[in-house]
Regions:
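A ligand-binding cleft/hinge motif common to bilobed small-molecule-binding domains
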Residues: 92-95, 108-118, 165-168, 182, ...
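Extracytoplasmic small-molecule ligand-binding "clamshell" domains
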Residues: 29-109, 117
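Short helix-initiation/N-cap motifs at beta->coil->alpha
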Residues: 67-70, 84-95, 141, 176-190, ...
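Periplasmic-binding protein-like
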Residues: 39-40, 126-137, 209-251, 269-281
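Flexible hinge/capping segments at coil-to-helix
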Residues: 53-54, 135-153
Length: 527
C-alpha cells in the first residue's frame, strides 16, 4: 500500500510538472505579440462573438474589438508579429506582464508614477479627459463644477487613477472602489451611488446606451486637475524590453487625425451601440437579445466550468483517499521507516492546513503568477485551474476520508487482522468500499462547490462561465440581465448534478433503497 500511495503521488507530481514544462515551452517567443486587456471596457476594448469590425480572436475565447485592438494590430504589424489577445482581469494585467504571460498591456492604462515603478510605458497613444457619470433625473444632474458634487456618493474603478481624482471633490462621500464599470453602472442605476468617475469615451458609451445616465463635463477651471501623464493612455511593457523603442516609432507613425478616426469608429462599432438601435427593448427582450448575442460564449464557459470542476473533484478525491489512507497507517517498528512516515505526515498536515486555510483566489494568484515570477514556470490558465481545484479539493477530501475510515467499526479491523489480512488488504477489501459509499454525499457536495468556486479563477483569466458573464456585461451594459442568465445556468448545473448523484447513491445502496409504488399505496389504504 505504501509503495502504491507513493507511486501514485509521484505520478500526479510528474504529470503536472510535464504539463507545466509543455506550457512553458509554448509561452516562449513564437513570433507572437501577446497583448493583455479586459475586453470589457468599451469603447477601448470589448468582447464579441464574431470578427465583425476588425475584431481579433481572443486566446481561448471569442473575439475582441475596440480602439485598443486596432492600435494593437498596428503595433503587431509594425513588429512583424502575430497579434494574440489575452483576456485578463484588470487586477491581473500587471502580474501577467511581469510574469511573462503577456508581452504588453494595451487596455486604456495610464502611465502613473506608481505604475512606472513596476512596469515601463511607451509614449501615449491616446489622451482623454475625465468626466462624472450621474443619473439624468438625479440630484446632481445639473452640476456645473466639482463643488456642486459636494456630499455626493462617488466611486471609480479599483486600482485606477480615476479613484484618486475623487478626493478633489469638496466634501465628497467617497465610496468603495468597484471592480469594473458594469458594477458601477448597476450601482448608479439602483441608487447605491450618485455617480462615478470615468474617461470621456466610456462616458459617451454609457450615456448612448442608457438614456437615464448623463455625462458631466466641466470647464478646465472647474474640473479635475490631472497631470498630462495621468490623462494619457500608453502601452505597458516589461522593464528592459528592447521593443519599447520600436513600439514608440510605430505609434509616432499614427497621426492624431487617424487616432481620432479610430476612436470615433470604435464608439460606433461597439456592440452596445449597434445593438441598441436594432433590438427590441423590454426586460424579456433584453434576456433574449443577450442570449442570442452571447449564448455561445456562456455555453463554452459553462462547459469549461464543468470540466474543471469534474476533473478537479475526481483528482482531488483520489488524492484525498491516498492521503487519508496514508495517515491511518500504523507506526512502523523500523526506526528509519517510522521517521519518514512521521515526516510524510508532517508535510501532509502542512499541505492540508495551507490549502484549507487560504482563499482559492489567493492560491490562484500565487500559483499562476508567482511560479512564473519566482521560478520561471509558466502554466497554461486551464492547467493552473485544474491544479488549483485538484489540490484544494484533495486537502478537504483527505480529512473527510480520514473521518470516514475512523467511522468504520473497529471490530472489522480486528476481525481482518485475526484472519491474517495486512493493513493494505484490510483497507482495500474491507474499509475503502465502505468509505467510498459513506463519503459519496460529501464528494457530490464538493463537486457542486467546485462548480461555483471556479468563478474565483477569473482572477487569472480562466474563461469559465462567470468570466464570460463579466465580459458580456462589460460590453452590453446590462449587468442585472446578464448575471441573471449566468445565475440560472449555475443553478441548472448544480441542480442536475445533485439529482444525478442521488440516483447514484440509490444504485450503490441496491434494491433495498427503493420502495415500490404498490407498497406505498397499500400502506396508505391501511392508514
Amino acid at each position: 500500500m505504501n509503495k502504491k500511495v507513493f507511486s501514485f503521488s509521484l505520478l500526479l507530481v510528474t504529470l503536472f510538472s510535464l504539463l507545466g514544462m509543455t506550457t512553458n515551452a509554448s509561452a516562449e517567443e513564437n513570433g507572437e505579440f501577446r497583448v493583455g486587456m479586459e475586453a470589457g471596457y468599451a469603447p477601448f476594448n470589448w468582447s464579441q462573438k464574431n470578427d465583425a469590425h476588425g475584431a481579433v480572436p481572443i486566446q481561448g475565447n471569442s473575439y475582441a474589438g475596440g480602439y485598443d485592438v486596432q492600435i494593437s494590430k498596428k503595433i503587431a504589424d509594425g513588429l512583424g508579429r502575430k497579434l494574440v489577445i489575452v483576456q485578463t482581469k484588470w487586477d491581473g494585467l500587471a502580474p501577467a506582464l511581469q510574469s511573462g504571460k503577456i508581452d504588453a498591456i494595451i487596455a486604456g492604462m495610464s502611465p502613473t508614477a506608481e505604475r512606472k515603478k513596476e512596469i515601463a510605458f511607451t509614449n501615449p497613444y491616446y489622451e482623454s479627459q475625465f468626466v462624472v457619470i450621474v443619473k439624468r433625473d438625479g440630484k446632481y444632474a445639473n452640476a456645473k463644477s466639482l463643488k456642486d458634487l459636494a456630499d455626493a456618493k462617488i466611486t471609480a474603478q479599483l486600482n485606477t487613477f480615476h479613484y484618486g481624482l475623487i478626493d478633489q471633490i469638496p466634501n465628497v462621500n467617497k465610496q468603495q472602489a468597484m471592480d469594473n464599470f458594469s458594477a458601477m453602472r448597476t450601482a448608479l442605476a439602483s441608487g447605491m451611488i450618485d455617480g462615478y468617475v470615468s474617461e470621456r469615451p466610456e462616458g459617451i458609451t454609457a450615456t448612448s446606451v442608457n438614456k437615464e445616465l448623463k455625462m458631466l463635463e466641466f470647464p478646465k477651471e472647474n474640473g479635475f486637475d490631472a497631470s498630462a501623464e495621468d490623462s494619457q493612455v500608453a502601452v505597458g511593457m516589461r522593464k528592459g524590453d528592447t521593443d519599447i523603442e520600436k513600439v514608440n516609432k510605430i505609434l509616432a507613425g499614427i497621426s492624431q487625425d487617424e487616432r481620432t478616426k479610430i476612436m470615433d469608429q470604435a464608439i460606433k462599432d461597439q456592440p452596445a451601440a449597434t445593438d441598441s438601435d436594432e433590438q427590441k427593448t423590454g426586460l424579456i427582450n433584453d434576456f433574449k437579445n443577450i442570449w442570442n448575442q452571447y449564448g455561445d460564449m456562456f455555453l463554452r464557459g459553462a462547459g469549461l466550468t464543468l470540466f474543471i470542476a469534474l476533473i478537479g473533484t475526481v483528482v482531488g478525491t483520489t488524492l484525498g483517499l491516498l492521503i487519508g489512507v496514508f495517515r491511518t497507517i500504523p507506526d512502523s517498528e523500523n526506526p528509519v521507516a517510522r521517521f519518514f512516515q512521521k515526516l510524510g505526515n508532517l508535510i501532509l498536515s502542512i499541505y492540508i492546513e495551507v490549502f484549507r486555510g487560504t482563499p482559492m483566489m489567493v492560491q490562484a494568484m500565487v500559483i499562476f503568477y508567482g511560479l512564473a515570477l519566482a521560478f520561471g514556470i509558466s502554466l497554461d490558465r486551464t492547467v493552473a485551474a485544474l491544479f488549483i481545484v485538484s489540490v484544494n479539493t484533495g486537502a478537504y477530501m483527505s480529512e473527510i476520508v480520514r473521518g470516514g475510515i475512523f467511522a468504520v467499526d473497529k471490530g472489522q479491523f480486528e476481525a481482518a487482522q485475526a484472519i491474517g489480512m495486512t493493513h493494505g488488504q484490510t483497507m482495500r477489501k474491507v474499509v475503502i468500499p465502505q468509505v467510498l459509499r459513506n463519503i459519496l454525499p460529501a464528494t457530490g457536495n464538493e463537486f457542486v462547490i467546485n462548480i461555483k468556486d471556479t468563478a474565483v479563477l477569473s482572477v487569472i483569466g480562466v474563461a469559465d462561465l462567470f468570466f464570460q458573464g463579466n465580459a458580456a456585461s462589460g460590453a452590453n451594459f446590462q449587468f442585472f440581465q446578464t448575471f441573471t442568465i449566468v445565475g440560472i445556468m449555475y443553478l441548472v448545473m448544480t441542480f442536475v448534478i445533485t439529482r444525478i448523484l442521488r440516483v447514484v447513491e440509490r444504485k450503490m445502496d441496491g434494491p433495498s433503497a427503493y420502495v415500490k409504488v404498490e407498497e406505498l399505496t397499500e400502506e396508505g389504504k391501511e392508514s
